[in-house]
Structure formats: structure tokens, C-alpha cells
Amino acid sequence: LIKDCVEKFINKYNLTGTFIVAFSGGYDSMCLLDVLSKISDDIVAVHLNHNWRGEESRLEEQNCREFANHANIKYYTETLSDDIEKTETAAREARYEFLKKCAKKFHSNIVFTAHNYDDNAETVLYRIIKGTGTIGLQGILEHRDIFYRPLLKTSRTEIEKYIKDNNLSPNIDSSNSNQKYKRNFIRHKIIPLLQEINPNVKDALNSL
């Protein structure tokens, strides 16, 4: 069970106090937020509206707000400045700055992000393609500084099952299917080709 995995993770790091949860409203972060809400009542869901997709971005933020309100979870949002460069790297940097700011605002040193098993496989592969040393092969760290990632051993399939079983309604980001973004290209094109050689390629990448 995902809840058991998250509880073990929290106990492993002896995490107490206010939990900040990076909440895009997608499958992964909605799953994580829902699980955490069953474990702790001291949670703040924080959402950064990139505002790159106009009305779609607005509706995603609205869905996040409504989910948090319905679950009685404290909610905070900001909208990304228009002058931020519209690239994956710039967006990632802006998100992490936002999360650090939220940690200070709510007097917390614990920020949860919902990176999962599949994300880690894709990250390792991306680093191999770009060229990396042994440190890069470690993939996404489950803990670094104030950031904690309790879903790294949970697959995307398990998360989708949790969402379905609990009748949750996550945001479906249309840009996730846009293969001009390198990570989407890896997810939708390269990984499936590698699975023809090794159906367990995600396990292989996670084991590096």
C-alpha cells in the first residue's frame, strides 16, 4: 500500500511538524497529498501556477484549490511571473525557489515532492544520454536539504490505481504529451523502444 510506504518513509526520517506538499494537481502530487492527509493534519498544499496555458492553467489551479478545501487542507498559491523564460530548466528553478519560499513562510523544513519510480528511471536515462558520472547515475535523491520524495519506490501504474480506487480527479496537463520537451520524448518514445529489448528496463535504470 502506498500509505504504508509513505508512513515508513516519514518514520525513517523522523519527520514531524508542518509538511509542505508541492501540489500541481496531477496524478502524482494528488496521490501524495491525499495519502499525507490521512497521516497528518499539519499540511500545506502549495501550487505554483505557471500560467503558460491560459485558461487550462487557471482551471488546474481551481481544481487544486477545490481539492484542498474539500479535504480541509491549508492551501497556498502564486502565479509565475510572465518574464520567466518558458523552458523546462527555468520552470524547474522557479518551482524550487517557490517551494523554498513556502517553507520559510510556513516555518517548515520539510517539503514533499511527488517524484516516482518511473520519473527516476527517466531521469537516469536522460543523464546517461547527456553524459554523466557515477553521481548522476544515482538518479533522484529521496532526501536532499529540505526536500523529501516518498514516492520514489512507487510506480506510475500504482499511483494511477490509487487515484482510480479513491475516485480522485487530478489535473491532466496537456503539455505532458508534447514531445518537444525532452523528458516527454524519453517517456513516450525512448522508454517504450528500450522495453522491446528489456521489458524491465525501468527496474534496470532504477538499480544503477
Model-flagged regions — what are they?
Residues 1-191:
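Core alpha/beta nucleotide-donor-binding catalytic domains of modification enzymes
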Residues 91, 193-208:
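An accessory alpha-helical subdomain
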